[in-house]
Amino acid sequence: MLKPIALALLASLSLAVAADAATPPDRYAPKPYVTLKHPAWSKDAILYQLNTRQFTPEGTFRAAEKQLPRLKALGVDIIWLMPVNPIGVQNRKGTLGSPYSVRDYYGVNPEFGTLADLKSFVNTAHRLGLHVILDWVANHTAWDNSLHAQHPDWYEHDWKGANRPTPWWDWSDIIDLDYSKPGLRRYMTDAMKYWVRTAGIDGFRCDVAGYVPLDFWENARAELDAIKPVFMLAEFDQRDVHRAAFDASYAWKWNNAMADIAAGKADVGALFGYYSEVQSAWPAEAMRMTYTENHDQNAWEGTEFERFGKALPAAIVLSFVGEGLPLIYNGQEAGNPRRLKFFERDPIEWRDHPNNDLFKRLIAFRKSHPALWNAPWGAAMTPVVNSAPTKVLSFVRAKNGDKVFALFNLSGDPQTVSFTDGPSDGSYVDFADGSALMITRATTVKLAPWSYRVLATSR
């Protein structure tokens, strides 16, 4: 007979075996984190931010519509329209107010035109093969938005019981919404769906997206995708937004690192830190929007010329050939040298500028090299170790036989570099002039201050 201890051990073993048998076979298999599907048309897309107020002398949708063929020829794919809604009057800033102080989520700002004008703009964009996303302000409204009178309980209140602008910022022209209220969530989602159905909008850039609960955005994305595949850009810098809500997010850390390098406050290590975090901590499907200018920076921090100085061309090129979703802010192609006024009419002065040719060539180059496409279609960056690692950024992006080798001298001194490992070896064509070049571990490359070399396998 078995002793009691032996019987107990046998029983425990039997239970363990039974438990293992009941365990699903994929218990330890990796599970996908990102559940949303990017629209197929975003795979190699370039974003273009259009500030209707300043884009043309007229400042209207109709005038902007006439410029769409030019934007198509430039090569951009997605037009991001800054908010199109009527602007609040109460506590308004400046003469015309901030477009981010929304008075009516279902209305069109008469400053820009009518709903028919907006629909005409979108229809023309679609005929040209472009897509249009709207800037959406879900975090707050103008003081005189009708929701304030109809649903005062949908708003945040401070310790005194008064309506509360977003804390700590000088946003006195707006008051915050309270997303603990299901009625508000339904209203806001329905308003977004209205623009997709009524005006043919293809998605949204969501202002201060991280100030609104993520579960709201995830549900809104599901309801929007049920109408048609949409593209969603979050003004936020957090990986979780990519799980089920947003295709793309702001690469604030990239922009700050590049600006610090240009100002002599950091070296290439700042970019190492950014790219390391993206590859180690962010989902591979996350599109990180890289840019050298947007409306906030231009208005409040300085033009791209002020922020990047002699490093600007290299910064622009890196935003296109490194990992990321490139953005062009209207006027960059004309080398706009001014800080555009935010609350007044201040039209861009359009002129011929080398930036236009640079953007056009970069876009064509990027589209012809799938290794440079947006996540998850493009390739990850593989660092290439060089002899000046604090001054020169060098990397390879390679996928399915397509290979791009890029070098950036991010310093004010000439550099001559060699390479100590082999991912860069190969025969290339230079982006700058089409010349052929062979790279081996014995090769040295000379780089002028703040210059770049972008080399690609011929296609």
Predicted regions and their residues:
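Active-site-proximal helices and loops of the catalytic beta/alpha 8
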Residues: A22-K31, T35, D190, R197, ...
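Structural recognition of the beta-strand scaffold that forms the well-ordered cores
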Residues: I46-Q49, I78-P83, I133-L134, G203-R205, ...
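Conserved, mostly hydrophobic/aromatic
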Residues: L50, L71, L81, Y105, ...
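Aromatic/acidic polysaccharide-binding cleft in carbohydrate-active enzymes
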Residues: M289-P354
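Asparagine-centered strand-capping/turn motif at beta-strand->loop junctions
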Residues: L407-S411
